[in-house]
Amino acid sequence: HLSLRRQRQMCIRDSNEGAFVSTILFSLSCPPDIPLWQAAMGISFGLVIGKEIFGGTGKNFLNPALTGRAFLYFAYPAQISGDKVWIAGISDYNLIPEGYSGATALGVAAESGMAGITNAYTWMDAFLGNIPGSVGETSIIAILIGLAVLLITKVASYRIVLGTFVGMILMSSILNIVGSETNPMFAIPWYWHAVIGSFAFGLVFMATEPVSGSGTNTGRWLYGIVIGVTVILIRVINPAFPEGMMLAILFANLLAPVIDHMVIMSNIKKRKALYNE
């Protein structure tokens, strides 16, 4: 009886902690002026459809916070995106502070390319967080502090972090070389991609989520590379969506079981070959 009671208490505590983390990450990924009823609907969808329906804590194959964010993006695109991307209807009531009344760096890049970004912001502005954006994505310094904590406590895998960064650098460099006369996003270098939009925030706090990511060491490298390549492809080639980290991570979530299966089968074949020798 005591054993069952302890197990039940542990399950309740784990479930509550998981829901708390998902709720915080969801809130940080939203625009600051999102209506509270939309925020409640989004996180409810993420927790119920993206997590509990598959068995709860430890059994979800999609990131719950991003699932809720994606639901809002497709259900209410006018409120959650637009010309100003993360900053929407609050401007109708003249409540936006002057320093945050412009389009985001990615929105500027989609319209004017590197010339537009450098005219509006400096790289240091983007690094320090002095640019428009969602609640949690703007300050790279704060995100790096979070990354250090996650790596030291071994909650996050450095393989996913490095794999995503390598994939992003590789894909953005290829597109820089290819170039485009009609799409200014082709010219954005990797070091700008790293500090604008939700790349850093998504990489540190969403992509490294252990449940929905790959579980094998080799698979984590591949999982990260898939995210890095996909986010650049979405940002650069899809003119309707200048961001891309959310969809890139969800796409990689779907591929994670396949990646792990391929890695495990490859390891089995190698061991069989060694055994037969």
Where are these regions (language model features)?
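Structural signature of hydrophobic alpha-helical transmembrane segments
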Residues: 33-42, 130-140, 186-199
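Loop-to-transmembrane alpha-helix initiation sites
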Residues: 61, 65, 190-199, 220, ...
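Membrane-interface helix-loop-helix junctions at boundaries between adjacent transmembrane segments
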Residues: 18-19, 24-95
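Long hydrophobic alpha-helical segments that form multi-pass transmembrane helix bundles
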Residues: 62-144
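Cytosolic-side transmembrane-helix boundaries in multi-pass membrane proteins
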Residues: 237-277
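Cytoplasmic-side transmembrane-helix entry/capping segments in multi-pass membrane proteins
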Residues: 13-22, 39-44, 59-69, 158-166, ...
